[in-house]
Regions:
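Bacterial N-terminal signal peptides that target proteins for export
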Residues: 1-6
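Short, linear, compositionally biased motifs with a strong N-terminal bias
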Residues: 10-11
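A generic "folded-domain core" signal
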Residues: 20-188
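N-terminal signal peptide c-region/cleavage motif recognized by signal peptidases
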Residues: 14-17
């Protein structure tokens, strides 16, 4: 299981076309000559939501990214048909407080939120290419994740007993709708 998850993490980290910490304006906006399309769909005091997808929407490589000055939460849909059949997507948590690693590893983390009980789970711990921060990656059932839920959530992540991520995420329903609409192109 660990080798499979590490393989998935390495593949997604190096082949995933969007790095959530990159400023949206650098991802290409609506320019068809850029590798990714990005569109801000919410700007608020707490942070900004940005949709990122391929210039021609295939329904794969869709993500919604909640970006604050300190962190990014990236909810990503399937990268290909195989992941889509299994309902797999990923949750990326990126923060300057997450240490860099020399190679991807599986790490126990404590995830607490206002909407769920505290959980101890395994996450992939990776370094972001070209970034000075690390990231934590959880494989998720993306269809369950975008179902109706509370519209805000405060998340905190501990790694090795130290808090490395905290964010009050707002406008979740809007983000879920944006991600679902983007992923629906794969079903057409």
């Amino acid at each position: 299981m660990k080798n499979w998850l590490i393989g998935l993490v390495v593949t997604m980290a190096w082949t995933s076309p969007c790095a959530a910490q990159i400023a949206p304006e650098l991802l290409g906006g609506a320019d068809p000559n850029k590798p990714m399309f990005s569109e801000s769909f919410y700007k608020g005091i707490e942070g900004n939501w940005v949709l990122v997808r391929e210039p021609v929407n295939t329904g794969y490589h869709c993500s919604v990214n909640f970006i604050t000055p300190d962190s990014t939460l990236s909810l990503r849909g399937p990268a290909d048909a195989g992941m889509a059949r299994k309902g797999h997507g990923s949750l990326w948590l990126i923060s300057g407080a997450i240490p860099l690693v020399t190679k991807p590893e599986i790490a126990p983390i404590t995830l607490s939120s206002t909407n769920h009980p505290t959980q101890n789970v395994q996450a992939a711990h990776v370094s972001m290419p070209g970034q000075s921060s690390g990231a934590l990656l959880l494989t998720i059932d993306v269809q369950k994740s975008v179902r109706e839920k509370p519209d805000s959530n405060e998340l905190a992540i501990q790694l090795q007993g130290k808090e490395v991520f905290r964010s009050k995420v707002v406008q979740l329903q809007l983000a879920y709708r944006q991600l679902s609409a983007c992923m629906s192109a794969a079903r057409k």
